[in-house]
Amino acid sequence: MSKISIIICSYNRANYIGAALDALYLQSSGLENFEAIVVDNNSTDGTPEVFTTWRTHHPEGSFYYTTETKQGASFARNTGAEIAKFDWLCFIDDDAIAHKDFVQNIIRHINDQPFVHGFGGRIIPRYIPAEPKWMSYYVSSMVGNFDYAPVACAFKNGKYPLESNMIVSKKIFEQIGGFNTQLPGVVGTVRIGGEGKDLFYKIMDLGHTIYYDPTIIVEHVVETKKLTKEYMYRVASGMGRGERARTKAISQKAFVYKIIEYLFKLGAALLLGINYALQGNPAKTGPIIQFRIDTLKGLLGY
């Protein structure tokens, strides 16, 4: 039976890392089928002490703690992958709560798809205390909402799993060189995203199909008080910065095509915003348009 190395990159989530570990500890698959590696990426909020206390009260299973001082999720995830013992790598966030059959369904998917090299699952936002009235389906991707299809299927070209719930074989991960550290994620107050997209595009370029399985579920904690305009700008512009770095590394032509794509998406956002207003949901209009403006600004280097 395949076994899983679950890698949790953590940065200042002492309030949530315990819940993430609890969910793994209670997996229906049993503790013998996976290991969990917490990679602390320079936390300053007592995360090491939280892990030590948690481990004292949960001595069974294979749960490990390590550090990575180079700031950014790509560095931390690569560190976790280097020390992982098993043939499959699963990456989740430090505020992601895995459903009880999470590991069991990952193993089942691997057994059902013997030639699979990468796949991902569903991500459900867990809003605290409640979903904001201005949140829409199109903006919710910024807080991790991901529900690609109602049944297991292959991703279409241009689609891929999100970083909070993705699984790759260690062999293919090492073959492509892991996560691109030129797309590190969050470094200080600057976000340069797209590391998961870059990873899966490289796997696809090798001729492999990426799959989606909606039974592999995590809930992503979203504190609505943190969803300020400044926060949403950092996330959206970070997506654009990541695409700027990724496409420019391919060619100037790829970068120009991405600008055209983003302009098209901005136009679509304007139409969607008008539609929300006409439907009596004007609170959703501004955020969906601002999202596309901010991603375009990041793409253009602003």
What are these regions (language model features)?
Residues 234-242, 248-302:
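Non-catalytic, C-terminal membrane-associated alpha-helical segments of glycosyltransferases
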Residues 89:
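Short aromatic/hydrophobic "clamp" motif used to bind/position activated sugar donors
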Residues 68-84:
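Glycine-rich, basic loop-to-helix element that forms the pyrophosphate-binding segment
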Residues 23, 40-49, 96-97:
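A conserved acidic beta->alpha catalytic loop
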Residues 13-26:
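Short, well-formed alpha-helical segments that are part of the catalytic scaffolds
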Residues 121, 138-159:
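Short, flexible, basic/aromatic active-site loop/helix in glycosyltransferases
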Residues 101-135:
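Conserved donor NDP-sugar-binding/catalytic core segment of glycosyltransferases
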